[in-house]
Structure formats: structure tokens, C-alpha cells
Amino acid sequence: MTKLDKKSVIGISALLVHAANIDEIYSKHEKDLVKEFIKTYLEKDNADEILKEAEEIENNSNQLLNYTNIIKKNPLEIKKDIIKNLWKVIISDNSIDQYESNLMRRICGLIYFSDKECAEIKLKLLNS
């Protein structure tokens, strides 16, 4: 899989943290999923440090557009993986609330990712 630069991983990780926080419950399991994403793209960096930086960015910003601009620049393969990781974080508590669904619709629209593909990824994860 294509690797991402550190700045992109931090930005996307901040978006994952945002998705985890949107239901106002940020669990250890969700943190672990974000760290798993970080380790996938940045093998040599400390995932805990990257996560902390992403959490700080998320706490100080609510600029969805900044996060999605990072995603938009990547090939379809990477976009699909990011959407998959966002859904993993969202469904990790076995519940999808209206804010989480709305967030995913907005993100997919902003990165020009079809609703159909987004739904297929979600269903695949729910059925696995």
C-alpha cells in the first residue's frame, strides 16, 4: 500500500479522532483503532506521539475542510482505506448515531467519494 507523509497521517488521524469524539464517547478501543491506522502508514514513527498530536489538533480545530483536503489529494485506493478506517472507528461501539452518519456523508461528499461506495464499505465492515 502507498505510504502517506507524516503531515497527512496526522491530519487524517485528527479526522479519525473527530469521528471517534462525535458521539461524545472516546474509548480506548477507538484510540487503538486510530493508532492502528497510524502504524499502517508510518511504520517508524511513534503512534502514541502522533495520536497525541492529532488529538491536540482536533481539540483546537473544527475545520472539516482542512482534513478532507488532505484526503482529496490521494489516489482512490488510499481514499477507500481512509473511509474504511473512519467507519471502523464509528462502528467500534456497535452503534451509528445520526451525527456519525451525517459526518460520513459530508466527508464522502467533500472528497468526491460516492455514497454507494461509502455504504458498501460500511456494510462490509458491519457484516464481518
What are these regions, as identified by a protein language model?
Residues 1-128:
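Small-residue-enriched hydrophobic alpha-helices in membranes
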